[in-house]
Amino acid sequence: MTITIAMAGKGGTGKTSLASLIIRYLLRHNAVPILAVDADANANLAWSLGLTVKQTIGSVLADFNDVKMGIPPGMTKEAYLNLKLNGAVVESKNVDLLTMGRGEGAGCYCFPNNVLKEFIDKLAVNYRFLVMDNEAGLEHLSRRTTENVDELIIVSNHSVKGVRTIGNILDLIKELKLNVKRQSIVINQAPGPLDPMIVAGLEELGVGADAVIPMDSLIADYDLQQKPLTELPDTSPAVRAVDGLMEKLLATRRADRERG
């Protein structure tokens, strides 16, 4: 059964970097194959994984809706669209990537998200893990594109605003009655130990930080050198923190299975 791990959080909190380091962990532990999904219109996950995207869900849909495109004789519209969508999957040895891209028009992402969700449901059964990097904010939750997940990673930077966003996300999960089996709180880009104001803010929400990922100059260095984050060394502080998070998540899943 495919295990789905999805990111949520405000912009600028490092969700893409975190998704990349989660994939790095899975690759290092041979937890493959992996389907990576970039559901952010401002797509960057491919770069972090060292992959090249030629087509996105958005571009496939735009082409498909072009009146000039003809459907081959004997093929239904649905079958042809599915064929074109499969062409948007970037394949590599152990991790494949699907990128949503932009919608049909400015600010229009609803149809691509609906198609993405249905397509992912069919595609995901072929993978051990699905790791989804979502767009900033709460839109993907309100549109229910992150509806059924095993592990929802709620990411905040070391800021009071970020903690408030955590509260908004937790409220929305309850309001929409989303099928989120477990949620983890991650404070990313921490300059040191958590500030008492951050700790107090989390306590007010009735949660704590499941992981604190320190600021890591290596991530900025790799960005400048245009190197995939999956190639970061084991000595990277961020890698160590994410590895610890994943060990905790997978240990909890094993314990849950043993309890039946």
Residue ranges of model-derived segments:
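C-terminal boundary of histidine-terminating zinc-finger modules
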Residues: 225-236
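Walker A/P-loop phosphate-binding motif and the immediately C-terminal alpha-helix
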Residues: 3-41
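Active-site signature of alpha/beta-hydrolase-fold catalytic machinery across serine-
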Residues: 21, 25, 48, 144
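C-terminal alpha-helix
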Residues: 241-252, 256
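Cytosolic-facing regulatory segments adjacent to core modules
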Residues: 79-87, 91, 96-132
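N-terminal phosphate/diphosphate-binding loop that engages ATP/GTP or pyrophosphate donors
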Residues: 28-91
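Conserved catalytic-core segment of NTP-binding enzymes
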Residues: 111-215, 221
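Conserved beta-strand scaffold positions in the cores of enzyme catalytic domains, especially
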Residues: 4, 36, 95-97, 209-212
